[in-house]
Structures are given as structure tokens and as C-alpha cells.
């Protein structure tokens, strides 16, 4: 009976459990941790806690280190210089300094060599006192050949003076009353004097002890105190207490003697007699000729001739001034034979001036900050040291590494520049086996980058900061490979160390070993970048300026001109200037720089509608398109490239004949880099800056450059009609995007973005020039961020 009941009950329980198990969602569902966190949130939370714990431990170690340094400083300050190292070692108390010890330390500074220049008439007697101590002289003479023990001196003086004077029993190191002037001493009551204050007569410098003259000087001071007292009987000042007997007994002669004695002895409450001037410094009469020597023209010329730039050195070597090459050959330097073979196969035999000036420093393993003009071979100047560093590291490597190390890291600001440097590096490694060059740039799949780094050799890595930081933060194993880094190179250092990239670069530097060589290259190095470069370079780094002090940073063969025209006519002027240059130059190759990517797209569409052979590159285009167009423009002639600033730095487009910059660049350095796309490898070129009248202020930043203003050309009515027809065919969305981008760019420029009302008027004029009847509306959030909310002429989307 009971067995049947139990059997049925167990069957029902088993069925219900089976139903529950079968209804449960298995696999693929969210796994939650305590607090409703998924596994990624749980993982990040513990990683954050680990980082906080590590930072806390580092702070504790830093505090312990600073405490140890403070202890060492105190031990040095308290150590007795006369007793040697034994006394310093035995004195290991770490408490705070007493006021007396602090005063002694300050007084010791005024006894050092050269401190006489800081003395004044209140610091003590100029000459030694003639009044010596009669009594107690025997005891002092007995110790004249040994260091002075001032406490014995004071005790002996007190015994001999106790018959005539009554000394206060309590020791005072300072006075709480303001009865005397600066550098005067104070005592407890009236003419009472604390003899223990003579303890301050003892100098702390070892040079003072053991000399007979100093003993005589201190003997004379004791004699003055015994014969006259410190101040005689002085009259107390306001708010001080005195008796009538003291004031009646005081005479005029006593006043003067007491005052002079006070001036001689100085202040026992502050510095005592340690600042007594033993010898008077005689002021030499300086003539006007010594103060203002006449200028020697020959000396000035000789000094100027010593300041030689690389250009002057090349002239001494009888090289033509306009040549970028030096007389030195690559086979004269310490470069591997296989690399020399690759150079000779490429037809490169001589070094450029930049390579000649930097290669020896870089091959010696020194840090360097290099400034050189655009198109003078900077890439080769740091690729050759990178290859030699890799060869040296591979030959000296001990054992087998668990992971394949990366020995050289090169940072670039743009994807195109990274790809170009990688191509040059692969050409130099043509005959080297087992050495690979890889790139990490945006626009490619993350997993493909990881697979390529793991499967192919990579001793030299060329990367943009953003993508490299993504690999470091995603724990892809790249951090461990970078721990063997030997050489860190930053190309276009002024841009990468600017505020835009600096935070990413600092994070990357934190992941690199400190024992490394660092090289920074750029065509423009402002003072701010020179200061920030200390984050990357060592203190003893070399600064190599191949341009020269006071020399122009642009190429001499590049003709620079500027056209100031109304902003509404810029889209009419650019096609006119292009057609004029095409007619005059059969093998033309032109780059047109625009302020933003969407304005670039608008300009490209306009020129394409006008049947010109044109290509475009900007940040909004996919990476495959950018690479394809860049390679096509390098290999072709009779082509126009419309681009934004992604092509402004480092890109080596050969034989560019004209560079047009529409609108002001972001700064002076950007103008120089844009212009540097022409005139490369010592060839000629032309640069044209097209600005509006309200952008004329930018010319003040270029006043040291040979920029020639030229009048705006007269536009033909046929050209105007063609431009208007082509502009009307462009899609409205492209125009609206160009308007928004133009407004954002000039709002970020300090000079134009300061006055929002004027900026709105200029934006409306730009809007009408591109064929829009009214300006497109902004999102409310965008208008608030730009500070344009409530400005008339800026419509807000509801």
C-alpha cells in the first residue's frame, strides 16, 4: 500500500521536474552576476578594482619614497660637519627641526663663499674689534689649534663675568616683543643678558673651525660683551616696560655706545654673530667703457659666422645652395650591406642634408628632435636607424622569446602617411630575410589586423595613434610584444603632440619601456611642442635644426602668392585658376586643399560637373577608396586632387606643379605643410592662397614667408555661367552638409568664432554662393554646443 503511494508520488515529482527542466531556456541566454551584471560588466568592474588597487599601491610607494628623501635631507642638515660621518650616522632622529637648529642652518648659508655679496651694514661689524678678552684668554689659546667648542667658551666666560653681571637662567632663542629694530637682540629684563645665546657664535662651516683668526675674532666679541655689556642701558620703546631708575641712570653717551655695540654684534635672536662681516669688500670704480664697451663690428661678424646652419655647411663643401643632397654617400656610414644593396637598387646613392645631419646621431642610439623642410628625406632618415636597430637587437637576442618582439614603433597622424612609410620600409628590407613591416591603421577590420600580426613577421610596426591604442586596450597581446621595444619614432611630431593627439600618445608611451631610443621628426616645431617633447625624449637629447635659425621654412623654388577676393566668388575663381594653369602647364598636377571634408566633396562635385579630370580624398571616404586614389595620383600626371588636411602632411606626391588652398588653414604650420606637397626633392612649384577679405588677419602669421599678393583675375561671363549651371546640378544634401561643415570650422577658429552674429551673416552669404535659397536648420543640441542658439540667421530644427 505504502509502496504504491510512494511510487506514484515519485513519478509525479519526476514529471514536474522534467517539465521544468524542459521549459528552461538553455544556451545563448544572458548570464547574470550579482547585482544584475552581465559577464562583461563583471569583468570590467574587477579590472577597474585591480587598477585602483595598483594605483593605491603606487601612491603608497611614492609616499614612502618621498618620506625617505625627506629623512635623508634632514639627516644632512642636522649632521655636525666637525664630527665626520660617525656623528651623522649616530644622529638618526627624524623629528621636526627646532627653531634654534633652523636659525643655525640659515646662518650657515651666509658664511659660504660668495655670500659676502648679500651682507649689508646691519649684518655686523665691517672690521675686527680691537678689544680682546683679557681674562679667560689662556683657556682659549689652549684650544686655538682645535675646533671651537662654543659651549665651553661660554661657560668660561660666564664664570669670569658672574662677579659683575647677573645672567638670566632661562634660555631664549627669540623675542616676543617688538622693542628693537631689525637684526637687534632682545633679553629678558633690562640689561640682563643670556650668556647661552653666545652659542650662536659657533659657525657651522668646517672652514671656520681651527683657524686662529676666527678664534681671535670670537675672543674680541666676548671682550666687547664683558666690558660694555650688549647695549649698555637702552631706553625701551613704545609698549615696553621700564623703571624710572633705568631711565634716570641712562646718559647720552651710554645710548650711543649701546647702539653701536648692537650694530656690531647683530641679532642673537635671529642669526647671532654668524653673519658678522670679517672683511670689508672694496667696491672697485667701474668706468663707463667697462660698463658699455664699444661694439666691435669684426667681433659681431665673427660671432654670426659661427652660427652656421646646415645650409652654410653645405656651401663650404661646395654644394649648390638649391640642392637638397650632400656630398656624403650612404656607403660611408655604418649601414648593413643588404640595406646598401637595396638603396643602390633604388638608385639612391647620396644622402640628403637631413640624412647627413641626423644619421650619425640616430645610429649612435641618442634621442633627437629633428626639424627639416618638407620633401627632404625625413622618412629615410628614421627608417634606416630603425632597420639597423632591428638587426642589432636580433643578433644580440638571447634565448627564444615566448612572443615575437616588436623592436621599432613608428607613429603617424594619418593612414595614408603610415601606408607610404610602410612601402618605403619594405623597399629597404628587400634583401633582408625574416624582418617584416606591418601597419595598424583605421578603416580595416580589427580581427584581420590581429591575424596578420600573429601570422606574419613584424619587427617594425607603423601605426596611427587611435588604432594602436585600440589594440593595446583590447588585450590583444600587443602590449607584451612592445615591452622589447628599442626605438620609438614620432613622425609629424608637432601634430601628434598637439592637444588633439597628445592624450592618446601619452597612453601609448605609458605602455612602452623606458630604456629606449626616441626620435621626433617634423617640418615645423613650435615652442609649445618643443616643451611637450620632454614627455618623449630624454633630457640630454639632441636638437637638430636643418633649416637654420632665421631661415625660411618653405622651399626657395616654390613661388607663393595670395589672392584676396570676396568669399562668394571662390567657387568661380577656383575653376578659372585651374583652367589657366592647365593651359600654361602641359604636364600639370594640382592639389586643391579645402577646409573640411564636406566642402571638399562639394568642390570635387563642382569640378567634375565642369568636365575636369579630378579625384577626391577626405576623412569621410572609406579607406580602400583613399588608398586607391592616393596611389593613382602618385603615378599619374594631368590630374587634379581635391582633398582635406588628410593629405597635408608627409605625403610624397611627386611632380606637383600647383597647390591651391581655399580658405585659411588652421594655423601657420598647416599652411607650410600644405605648401610642402610641391617643390619636393629640390624641384620647383607654385602655391596659391585664396582667402576672403575678413580672413586677411591670417597674413600676419605668414609675414616672414615670401608671400606675394596678386590681384584677383577678371572672371569671364562664360565661366560664371558654367559654374552656376554646374552648381545647380549638385544634390541639395551635399550643399547642406557643406554649409554645416563650413559653419562648424569657422566657429572653431578663434578670430571668426568670437562674434557669433557676424559669423551667422558670413554663413548666410556662403549659403547663397553655393545655390541654397535659405540656410539649412541646425539641431538644437548642435546649436547649443556651438553657442549659436538664439543667434539671428541660424535656424534651429524643431
UniProtKB/Swiss-Prot annotation:
TM segment ranges: none
Sequence motif: Q motif, positions: 328-356
Region listing for Disordered, in residue ranges: 76-100, 117-148, 236-257
Domain Helicase ATP-binding: 359-543
UniProt binding sites for ATP: 372-379
Presence of the UniProt keyword Mitochondrion in the record: no
The entry's keywords: ATP-binding, Helicase, Hydrolase, Nucleotide-binding, RNA-binding
Biased composition (Low complexity): 132-148
PANTHER family: RNA HELICASE
Family label: Belongs to the DEAD box helicase family.
Annotated protein name in UniProt: Probable DEAD-box ATP-dependent RNA helicase 48
Source organism of this protein record: Arabidopsis thaliana
Name of encoding gene: RH48
Amino acid at each position: 500500500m505504502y509502496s504504491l503511494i510512494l511510487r506514484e508520488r515519485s513519478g509525479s515529482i519526476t514529471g514536474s521536474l522534467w517539465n521544468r527542466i524542459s521549459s528552461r531556456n538553455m544556451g545563448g541566454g544572458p548570464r547574470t552576476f550579482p547585482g544584475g551584471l552581465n559577464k562583461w560588466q563583471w569583468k570590467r568592474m574587477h579590472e577597474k578594482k585591480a587598477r585602483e588597487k595598483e594605483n593605491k599601491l603606487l601612491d603608497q610607494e611614492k609616499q614612502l619614497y618621498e618620506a625617505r628623501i625627506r629623512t635623508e635631507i634632514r639627516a644632512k642638515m642636522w649632521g655636525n660637519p666637525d664630527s665626520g660621518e660617525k656623528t651623522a650616522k649616530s644622529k638618526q632622529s627624524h623629528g621636526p627641526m627646532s627653531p634654534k637648529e633652523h636659525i643655525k642652518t640659515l646662518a650657515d648659508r651666509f658664511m659660504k663663499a660668495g655670500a659676502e655679496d648679500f651682507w649689508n651694514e646691519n649684518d655686523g661689524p665691517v672690521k675686527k674689534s680691537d678689544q680682546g678678552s683679557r681674562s679667560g684668554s689662556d683657556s682659549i689659546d689652549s684650544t686655538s689649534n682645535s675646533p671651537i667648542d662654543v659651549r665651553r667658551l661660554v661657560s668660561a666666560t660666564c664664570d669670569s663675568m658672574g662677579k659683575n653681571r647677573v645672567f638670566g637662567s632661562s634660555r631664549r632663542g627669540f623675542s616676543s616683543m617688538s622693542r628693537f629694530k631689525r637684526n637687534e637682540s632682545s633679553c629678558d629684563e633690562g640689561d640682563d643678558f643670556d650668556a647661552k645665546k653666545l652659542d650662536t657664535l659657533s659657525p657651522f662651516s668646517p672652514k671656520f673651525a681651527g683657524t686662529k683668526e676666527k678664534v681671535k675674532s670670537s675672543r674680541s666679541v666676548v671682550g666687547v660683551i664683558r666690558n660694555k655689556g650688549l647695549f649698555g642701558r637702552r631706553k625701551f620703546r613704545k609698549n615696553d616696560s621700564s623703571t624710572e631708575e633705568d631711565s634716570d641712570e641712562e646718559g647720552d653717551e651710554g645710548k650711543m655706545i649701546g647702539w653701536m655695540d648692537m650694530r656690531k654684534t647683530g641679532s642673537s635672536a635671529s642669526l647671532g654673530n654668524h653673519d658678522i662681516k670679517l672683511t670689508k669688500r672694496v667696491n672697485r670704480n667701474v668706468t663707463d667703457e667697462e660698463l658699455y664697451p664699444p661694439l666691435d663690428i669684426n667681433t659681431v661678424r665673427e660671432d654670426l659666422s659661427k652660427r652656421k646652419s646646415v645650409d652654410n655647411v653645405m656651401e663650404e663643401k661646395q654644394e649648390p645652395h638649391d640642392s637638397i643632397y650632400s656630398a656624403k654617400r650612404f656607403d660611408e656610414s655604418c649601414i648593413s650591406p643588404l640595406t646598401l644593396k637595396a638603396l643602390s637598387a633604388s638608385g639612391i646613392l647620396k644622402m640628403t642634408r637631413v640624412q647627413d645631419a641626423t644619421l650619425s646621431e640616430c645610429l649612435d642610439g641618442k634621442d633627437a628632435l629633428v626639424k627639416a623642410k618638407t620633401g627632404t628625406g625625413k622618412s629615410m632618415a628614421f627608417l634606416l636607424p630603425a632597420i639597423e636597430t632591428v638587426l642589432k637587437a636580433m643578433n644580440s637576442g638571447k634565448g627564444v622569446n615566448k612572443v615575437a618582439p616588436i623592436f621599432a614603433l613608428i607613429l603617424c597622424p594619418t593612414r595614408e602617411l603610415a601606408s607610404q612609410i610602410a612601402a618605403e620600409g619594405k623597399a629597404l628590407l628587400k634583401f633582408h630575410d625574416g624582418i617584416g613591416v606591418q601597419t595598424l591603421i583605421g578603416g580595416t577590420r580589427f580581427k584581420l589586423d590581429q591575424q596578420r600580426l600573429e601570422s606574419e613577421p613584424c619587427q617594425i610596426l607603423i601605426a596611427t595613434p587611435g588604432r594602436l591604442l585600440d589594440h593595446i586596450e583590447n588585450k590583444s597581446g600587443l602590449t607584451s610584444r612592445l615591452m622589447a621595444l628599442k626605438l620609438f619614432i614620432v613622425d609629424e611630431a608637432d601634430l601628434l603632440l598637439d592637444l588633439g593627439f597628445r592624450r592618446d600618445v601619452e597612453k601609448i608611451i605609458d605602455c612602452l619601456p623606458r630604456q629606449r631610443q626616441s626620435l621626433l621628426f617634423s617640418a615645423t616645431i613650435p615652442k609649445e611642442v618643443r616643451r611637450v617633447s620632454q614627455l618623449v625624449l630624454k633630457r640630454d637629447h639632441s636638437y637638430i635644426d636643418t633649416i637654420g635659425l632665421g631661415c625660411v621654412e618653405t622651399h626657395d623654388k616654390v613661388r607663393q602668392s595670395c589672392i584676396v577676393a570676396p568669399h562668394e566668388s571662390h567657387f568661380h575663381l577656383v575653376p578659372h585658376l585651374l583652367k589657366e594653369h592647365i593651359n600654361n602647364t602641359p604636364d600639370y598636377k594640382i592639389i586643391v586643399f579645402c577646409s573640411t571634408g564636406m566642402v571638399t566633396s562639394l568642390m570635387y562635385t563642382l569640378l567634375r560637373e565642369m568636365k575636369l579630370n579630378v579625384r577626391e580624398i577626405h576623412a569621410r571616404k572609406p579607406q580602400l577608396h583613399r588608398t586607391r586614389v592616393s596611389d593613382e595620383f602618385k603615378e599619374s600626371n594631368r590630374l587634379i586632387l581635391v582633398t582635406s588636411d588628410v593629405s597635408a602632411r608627409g605625403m610624397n606626391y611627386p611632380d606637383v606643379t600647383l597647390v591651391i588652398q581655399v580658405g585659411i588653414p588652421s594655423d601657420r604650420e598647416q599652411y607650410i605643410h600644405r605648401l610642402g606637397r610641391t617643390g619636393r626633392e629640390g624641384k620647383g612649384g607654385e602655391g596659391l592662397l585664396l582667402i576672403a577679405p575678413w580672413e586677411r588677419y591670417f597674413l600676419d602669421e605668414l609675414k616672414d614667408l615670401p608671400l606675394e599678393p596678386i590681384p584677383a583675375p577678371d572672371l569671364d561671363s562664360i565661366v560664371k555661367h558654367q559654374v552656376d549651371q554646374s552648381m545647380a546640378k549638385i544634390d541639395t544634401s551635399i550643399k547642406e552638409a557643406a554649409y554645416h561643415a563650413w559653419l562648424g570650422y569657422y566657429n572653431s577658429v578663434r578670430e571668426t568664432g568670437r562674434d557669433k552674429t557676424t559669423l551667422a551673416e558670413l554663413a548666410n552669404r556662403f549659403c547663397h554662393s553655393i545655390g541654397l535659397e535659405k540656410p539649412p536648420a541646425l539641431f538644437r543640441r548642435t546649436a547649443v554646443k556651438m553657442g549659436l542658439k538664439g543667434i539671428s540667421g541660424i535656424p534651429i530644427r524643431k
